[in-house]
């Protein structure tokens, strides 16, 4: 057991280290001719920002008086301002709109790398596609001060994910537009760690739940199991083998409009799950005649379709 704990600590330390990189040379330390001057000096020209900075979470670095100059207030992000103040113009200061995106990420991670939720940010699909901190966060003028988002979370995500926005307008959907859920209830925008299930098909930013399971389990805990009689697609392929995650034209957000057509994707005559083994046949006198509407709603009898503790065939 001790060895297992040691391994976990080692992996966590390695993961956090992976999120960190040495600061670029121009962000490292103040030189003799470019010293830290303190945030009070910034007020002389940037009062439109500093007057409300007390509401900003970054103001804690000033109030605590415990941080080093390179991690305090304005200069914690924009670098030493000595030369900038002397020149009186926009030179010799780190202006985020004009620096490379990799440098933006490096700057923010000087402070924001010590949590597991951001440990995989360099490999996240956002970073890989050129989306960095300032694309989503507005440090000086955020309408959502808690996370300094540039817009409300839903509208921010919809700015890029227009196809998902359309899905949330379908008849059967998760109620994100109504305010009952947020995108981050299921996704980690900073990059989650790929769960062990369906490694090749799940997006990296889907946050897994509990014991390395799908995020759906956070709300649908009754479907989690373990069950005495597991339904293989639920345990192996996951929820998306039958459901779509955002919205659908089909009841219960199913992938197909008619239940039996979805079931026949697996119970179709191949292997041990075939029509012969299950009694599902197309002949008129077979136990399950798919031409008869009576047998086209499989869940009418196989009620415990996510798994059962009582019946091998998921009957009530």
Predicted regions and their residues:
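Bacterial N-terminal signal peptides
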Residues: 4-14
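Short sequence/structural segments immediately N-terminal
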Residues: 17-316
């Amino acid at each position: 057991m001790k060895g297992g704990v040691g391994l976990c600590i080692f992996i966590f330390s390695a993961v956090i280290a992976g999120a960190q990189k040495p600061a670029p040379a121009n962000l490292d330390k103040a030189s003799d001719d470019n010293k830290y001057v303190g945030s009070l000096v910034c007020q002389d020209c940037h009062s439109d920002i500093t007057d409300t900075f007390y509401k900003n979470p970054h103001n804690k670095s000033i109030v605590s008086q415990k941080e080093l100059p390179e991690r305090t207030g304005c200069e914690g992000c924009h670098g030493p301002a000595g030369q900038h103040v002397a020149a009186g113009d926009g030179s010799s200061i780190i202006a985020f709109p004009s620096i490379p995106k990799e440098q933006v990420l490096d700057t923010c991670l000087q402070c924001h790398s010590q949590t597991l939720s951001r440990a995989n940010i360099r490999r996240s699909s956002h970073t890989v596609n050129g989306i960095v901190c300032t694309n989503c966060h507005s440090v000086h003028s955020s309408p959502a001060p808690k996370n300094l988002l540039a817009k409300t979370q839903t509208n921010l995500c919809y700015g890029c994910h227009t196809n998902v926005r359309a899905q949330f307008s379908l008849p059967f959907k998760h109620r994100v537009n109504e305010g009952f859920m947020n995108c981050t209830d299921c996704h980690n925008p900073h990059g989650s760690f790929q769960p062990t299930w369906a490694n090749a098909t799940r997006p990296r930013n889907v946050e897994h739940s509990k014991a390395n399971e799908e995020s759906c389990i956070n709300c649908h805990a009754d479907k989690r199991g373990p069950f005495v009689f597991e339904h293989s697609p639920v345990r192996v392929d996951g929820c998306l083998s039958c459901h779509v995650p955002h919205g659908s034209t089909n009841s219960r957000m199913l992938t197909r409009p008619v239940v039996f057509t979805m079931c026949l994707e697996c119970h179709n005559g191949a292997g041990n799950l075939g029509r012969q083994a299950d009694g599902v046949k197309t002949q008129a006198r077979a136990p399950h005649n798919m031409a008869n509407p009576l047998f086209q709603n499989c869940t009418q009898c196989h009620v415990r379709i996510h798994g059962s503790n009582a019946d091998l065939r998921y009957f009530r």
